[in-house]
Amino acid sequence: MAQTTNDIKNGSILNLDGQLWQVIKFQHVKPGKGPAFVRTTIKNVLSGKIVDKTFNAGMKMDFETVDNRTLQYSYEDGDNFVFMDMTTFDQIMIPKTLVGDKAKYLLEGTDCIVSFHDGQPLSVELPASVVLTITHTEPGLQGNRSNAGTKPATVETGAEIQVPLFIGEGEKVKVNTDDGSYLGREN
C-alpha cells in the first residue's frame, strides 16, 4: 500500500526493492537549511541485517500490512519452536532465529505476539517481563560487596541473570525479557 515517509512508525514494514524491512527506530529531521528528511534504522525481515537509511520527507513508499496474532509457546522441536493459536488450536512452527536471544526467557505457556506477512512469520515479541524460578545460585554473603550486592543465578530456562544477594534457590523472580535484568520477587 503506497504511503509516504511521513507515515513511518516503529514496527512498520516497508517493501524496498522487493525485500521486507522492519523499522526499528526513526526520526523526522527538519534542518535549518534544506529539505526535511527521515532518518531510520531498519532490519531486513528475512536476513536480520540492520542498516541505517535516510529518506526524503514526503517520498512515496510501499508499506506492507502485517497480521499480529497472540500465540502460546508449547515446546521446542529441532530448529523450531512450536506455538499454538489458542483460538483455532493450530500448531505453528516458528524458526528459532526469529526469537533470537530472547529464547532463553521462553517458558512453556508464555503468550507471545507473532507478526505474519502473507502467512509467513516475521517476528516474535515476548512479553515485557516473565516470572521464572531460580534453579541454582550461590548463597549471598552480606560482606561480599565486590559487585554492588548482586550475584549470578540460573533460572529454569537455563538463562543466567544477576539477582540481589537475598534471593535463594526455588524463589520466583520477575525478569525483563529485553535485557535480562532482575525486576523483583514474585509470590
From Swiss-Prot:
InterPro entries for the chain: Elong-fact-P_C, NA-bd_OB-fold, Rib_uL2_dom2, Transl_elong_fac_P/YeiP, Transl_elong_KOW-like, Transl_elong_P/YeiP_cen, Transl_elong_P/YeiP_CS, Transl_elongation_fac_P
Compartment(s) of residence: Cytoplasm
MF terms in GO: translation elongation factor activity
Pfam family membership, one: Elong-fact-P_C
Biological processes, Gene Ontology terms: peptide biosynthetic process
Entry-linked SUPFAM superfamilies: Nucleic acid-binding proteins, Translation proteins SH3-like domain
One cellular component (GO) term of this entry: cytoplasm
Pathway(s) the chain acts in: Protein biosynthesis; polypeptide chain elongation
UniProt KW keywords: Cytoplasm, Elongation factor, Protein biosynthesis
The organism's place on the tree of life at top rank: Bacteria
Keyword field contains Protein biosynthesis: yes
Family: Belongs to the elongation factor P family.
PANTHER family xref list: ELONGATION FACTOR P (PTHR30053), ELONGATION FACTOR P (EF-P) FAMILY PROTEIN (PTHR30053:SF12)
Cited function: Involved in peptide bond synthesis. Stimulates efficient translation and peptide-bond synthesis on native or reconstituted 70S ribosomes in vitro. Probably functions indirectly by altering the affinity of the ribosome for aminoacyl-tRNA, thus increasing their reactivity as acceptors for peptidyl transferase.
UniProt-recorded name of the protein: Elongation factor P
